[in-house]
Amino acid sequence: MANILRTVIENDKGELKKLDKIAKKVDSYADHMAALSDEALQAKTPEFKERYQNGETLDQLLPEAFAVVREASKRVLGLYPYHVQIMGGIVLHHGDIPEMRTGEGKTLTATMPVYLNAISGLGVHVITVNEYLSTRDATEMGEVYSWLGLSVGINLAAKSPFEKREAYNCDITYSTNAEVGFDYLRDNMVVRQEDMVQRPLNYALVDEVDSVLIDEARTPLIVSGPVSSEMNQLYTRADMFVKTLNSDDYIIDVPTKTIGLSDTGIDKAENYFHLNNLYDLENVALTHYIDNALRANYIMLLNIDYVVSEEQEILIVDQFTGRTMEGRRFSDGLHQAIEAKESVPIQEESKTSASITYQNMFRMYHKLAGMTGTGKTEEEEFREIYNMRVIPIPTNRPVQRIDHSDLLYPTLDSKFRAVVADVKERYEQGQPVLVGTVAVETSDLISRKLVAAGVPHEVLNAKNHFKEAQIIMNAGQRGAVTIATNMAGRGTDIKLGEGVRELGGLCVIGTERHESRRIDNQLRGRSGRQGDPGESQFYLSLEDDLMRRFGTDRIKVVLERMNLAEDDTVIKSKMLTRQVESAQRRVEGNNYDTRKQVLQYDDVMREQREIIYANRREVITAERDLGPELKGMIKRTIKRAVDAHSRSDKNTAAEAIVNFARSALLDEEAITVSELRGLKEAEIKELLYERALAVYEQQIAKLKDPEAIIEFQKVLILMVVDNQWTEHIDALDQLRNSVGLRGYAQNNPIVEYQSEGFRMFQDMIGSIEFDVTRTLMKAQIHEQERERASQHATTTAEQNISAQHVPMNNESPEYQGIKRNDKCPCGSGMKFKNCHGLRCLQ
């Protein structure tokens, strides 16, 4: 371990030497740039653009370009980046992460690589965690870019597609991580090219990169639509049932936070719902509702996992920031189960139309960089997942903060009494205090105790984060006491008021350790910015969540040896601090493994999504007749149908192929079984294709306007692709939920998911081509299709395409008892739901 640590330190030192050398080159231009007039300095931007177009690389332009931004910052903002900030900027340009302490000027540091990369004209995205920071940084730093002749855009959720497109077309675009992700998904759902807003993803610089790429890595961005459902009553009934249970009726696994019915619980469920066997196949849906009701009532906690808004809506609380996540909903029916639990209106379930995780969203950028004050603990994950190094940048001034050893108390009550006593004593001295909590519930509890103790204070949590910046800015004033949920207010500096330095600076008090050391370090880092004095102190108890779930046997043995008879006994020990950090490392390792596994699953979806979206984009951007593509689909559909009967009896095969042709390609009288008898497979395929082509030409001939033909082709393909892709996403979700059980059969769930997912994707492609073929060949193409498509392409789709009645005869005995996903007996090779089952299923 010592050797590994020594190697890491030596590598960091070597990297800093290289950075220092480049930064000195930037310094060497300082006097030259200072001597230039404003006009001459501003003229550097078009000069750099021309040199870049003539073959100079951004690396070659870096020293001079950084020096230009540095001088411009001094003239426009009155701020001049330090030498260490130049080093941080170089790291950002190289697509890595400079670890810069709180207050070291990360926002100003970013101006240099952002300007340099904007010279290429390919676009730079500066990503922040909320719209307040995007607007603030774009407004402040945008003055420098605008002065230097670059355009700056702000991408906000409330903006129209036109305004978003304008923002993305700017040289530099400020946006939140969520909005960039949703815009990407929405761009891949539009029907017309002019409705797309983003350019190709070039360079992203992510502020608070650990929050976005680590803490929220598993969070999927989901675009979904409502599904008409009358199942709300089942949510309510399941909720009423689980509320009748005793603690013996269910089993909770605390470390994994999972829950299930015990044997007595199963008996009660069968009696309550009048069932013979709860786990019969026909009760699968009901067990899903019961499982969600159990989780909602006994795992998900009010004011910790979610809050109830004044509008009677369930809002998710971000476990890492303490903020409510507007617009987000728990998936798979859990959100509805919580709504039933809290007796608020139950909203309809939704169907996923598109989804992506932040991991895969940001890996699509040509170059990705990020800034944070606490990235070193997650270095392995940044390197393995995102191919980004974490390089600690020295502080401009030495850190003066004093970090005290943890204090451990036997109970939560004794711990909180000690916290309140400490806060009150410091308040009376005038020293500002920032109290960090992990949950909204804890911040409210401490607030009540401080009110009782007569200590005035501000509370910053998920319930009032809209004014967090103002509260945080005042947290360093003399006598200020601020309670903040976790890292709420991150991104806003706490500046010390007059006379506070003499009192010891800002004191940060942590009311418990977080699962991640990084989050604890972020809380500590709010104090002692830019060489200011400060203190940090963590208070722990044996009843804390981390201690209960992951406290080591060694900690317990040590505590048993100590006399903890008195409730207010306190233990202060470096060994204890080391043991707690050891527990945190184990949790971090578990969380990393989980995120890595999520990525392995999501990579299957990523590969398939990229294929679908690339093909979709080709269709949208096409300005030519898509006939060759459609003819290819017809040919492959015929091939699949004929090949599906290659081993069947010739007469049976001929009948099945004719049934397929009549249902998907031709009029009933256009093909007979006798015509196919005696023909080889290749000849049958050729015959069907020739006749199908004739029908295709007749259909297209109804559209005399070439533009109308292209519009019709596009809408047809996109409509089918989008419907099938939405179904496929749901199917993959179901597969992912079920494939874990295969581990019990000694099969690797991820390998099973990959192979099964690939097979399902192949089936989906076949279904897309079959649906396009059948709709194209059987559609009634109306007169209005000769007109140019209307402004709303989706409306046009409804006008242009109305499938003819396709003879299905589902009442025929041969179709009785066929399941949705079984092969259709007609011989098409398609699933029943996509063929003769389509009508009855609808």
Curated annotation (Swiss-Prot):
GO terms for biological process: intracellular protein transmembrane transport; protein import; protein targeting; protein transport by the Sec complex. The keyword Metal-binding applies. InterPro entries: Helicase_ATP-bd, Helicase_C-like, P-loop_NTPase, SEC_C_motif, SecA, SecA_CS, SecA_DEAD, SecA_motor_DEAD. It catalyses: ATP + H2O + cellular proteinSide 1 = ADP + phosphate + cellular proteinSide 2. Pfam families: P-loop_SecA (PF21090), SEC-C (PF02810), SecA_DEAD (PF07517), SecA_PP_bind (PF01043), SecA_SW (PF07516). ATP binds at Q85, G103, E104, G105, K106, T107, D493. It is a peripheral membrane protein. Keywords: ATP-binding, Cell membrane, Cytoplasm, Membrane, Metal-binding, Nucleotide-binding, Protein transport, Translocase, Translocation, Transport, Zinc. SMART domains: SecA_DEAD (SM00957), SecA_PP_bind (SM00958). It comes from the Bacteria. May bind 1 zinc ion per subunit. Its main location: membrane. The keyword Endoplasmic reticulum does not apply. Zn(2+) binds at C824, C826, C835, H836. Its EC number is 7.4.2.8. It is found in: Cell membrane; Cytoplasm. One of its GO terms (cellular component) is cell envelope Sec protein transport complex. Its cofactor is Zn(2+). Transmembrane segments: none annotated. It is an enzyme of class 7 (translocase). Belongs to the SecA family. NCBIfam families: PRK09200.1, secA. HAMAP family: SecA. Monomer and homodimer. Part of the essential Sec protein translocation apparatus which comprises SecA, SecYEG and auxiliary proteins SecDF. Other proteins may also be involved. Part of the Sec protein translocase complex. Interacts with the SecYEG preprotein conducting channel. Has a central role in coupling the hydrolysis of ATP to the transfer of proteins into and across the cell membrane, serving as an ATP-driven molecular motor driving the stepwise translocation of polypeptide chains across the membrane. This is Protein translocase subunit SecA 1.
